[in-house]
Amino acid sequence: MKVLLIKDVKGLGKAGEIKEVKDGYGNNFLIGKGFAKAATPDVLRQYEAAQKRKAEELKYEIANLEKLKEELAKVTVVVKKTLGANGSLFGSVSKEEIAAELEKTHHLVVEKKAIDLDTHLKAVGLYDVSIKLGHSINATLKVDVQGE
C-alpha cells in the first residue's frame, strides 16, 4: 500500500514523502494515528495544490519582507530620553521604545522581539540597530538617541 506521509515518522520518512508500506501498518498505525493518508490520485492532487499555494504564500511573504527591509534602511528613528546632570541618559533605550517610536512616526510595524540590540543604548548618539525580519532577512535601522 502506498501512503503520503502527513507528519515525519521516525524510521520511515519525512512529511510529504510517498512510501510503500504493508497494509496493516499503513491502515492501522499510520492512517489511524493521522501520520499519513492513502496515496490516491485525488489525495496527491490536493497535496500538490497545497504545496503550490504554500510556495506562493512564501514568495509573497519574502517580497513583503524585502520591501520592509528597504523602507527600514531609509528611516531614522528619533528617541528622546531625559538626561541626567552629567549628560548621560536615565536608563537605556529599550526595544519596546524603538518599536513604538517606529510605528508612531513612520507607520512601520516591527515586533519588539525582532529588534536585536547588541549593546544597551545608554548614551546620546546615532546607532545602527539590527532587525531580524525572518526568512534570513535582516534589516538595519538607524536610531538617533537625543536628550531632553
Curated annotation (Swiss-Prot):
Provide the coiled-coil residue spans: none
The record's PROSITE patterns line, in alphabetical order, gives: RIBOSOMAL_L9
**Keywords, ordered alphabetically:** Ribonucleoprotein, Ribosomal protein, RNA-binding, rRNA-binding
Cellular component GO terms, alphabetical? ribonucleoprotein complex; ribosome
Organism's domain of life? Bacteria
> What is this protein identified as?
Large ribosomal subunit protein bL9
Biological process (GO), any one? translation
Tell me, in a sentence or two, what this protein's role is: Binds to the 23S rRNA.
- Which family, according to the similarity comment? Belongs to the bacterial ribosomal protein bL9 family.
Q: Which PANTHER family does the record cross-reference, listed alphabetically?
A: 50S RIBOSOMAL PROTEIN L9
Q: Which InterPro entries has this protein been placed in?
A: Ribosomal_bL9, Ribosomal_bL9/RNase_H1_N, Ribosomal_bL9_bac/chp, Ribosomal_bL9_C, Ribosomal_bL9_C_sf, Ribosomal_bL9_N, Ribosomal_bL9_N_sf
A GO MF annotation of the entry reads: structural constituent of ribosome
**Which Pfam family, giving just one, matches this sequence?**
Ribosomal_L9_N
